[in-house]
Amino acid sequence: MRKILYALIACVAFCAQSCQESLEDKAEREAKEYTKSFCPTPTVNYTRTDSVVFYKSTKSYTYYCSFSDAFDNEEIVNKNKQAIHEGIHKMLTDNPGLKSYKEAGFKFVYIVHSTKEPTKILYQYSFSFTK
């Protein structure tokens, strides 16, 4: 009987603790887990995700990426900036996993660096979905 009671108490304590994670804490944890598990990602369409960070102070989910090869060129990026912007916006809009973050007013920031010159920013934009 005592074992069942202790197991029940442990289960209730665990459930209560997991329910207390704020949306900001969840975003921070998920960003860290994604970065640890997947970054840097393989390069696809000349783009690699280097890391993902959630900044609680600004409620910003920030993606740090790099352009490589043909896209690692400021002139080409500038010519295609609108298409890049629209593609990222569509990806964020169509992602159901981000719904609660968008509803909470989180911003999604993309900062894309050059692979050849890592300190050079080729693209940067902050997307907001508040109504």
Residue ranges and their predicted role:
Residues 1-2, 88:
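Short, intrinsically disordered low-complexity segments
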Residues 2-9:
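Sec-dependent signal peptide recognition
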Residues 15-18:
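C-terminal motif of bacterial Sec signal peptides marking the signal peptidase cleavage site
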Residues 20-22:
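Bacterial signal peptide processing site
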Residues 24, 28, 32-33, 37, ...:
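Polar/charged, Gly/Pro-rich intrinsically disordered segments
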Residues 73-99:
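Short, non-transmembrane amphipathic alpha-helical segments
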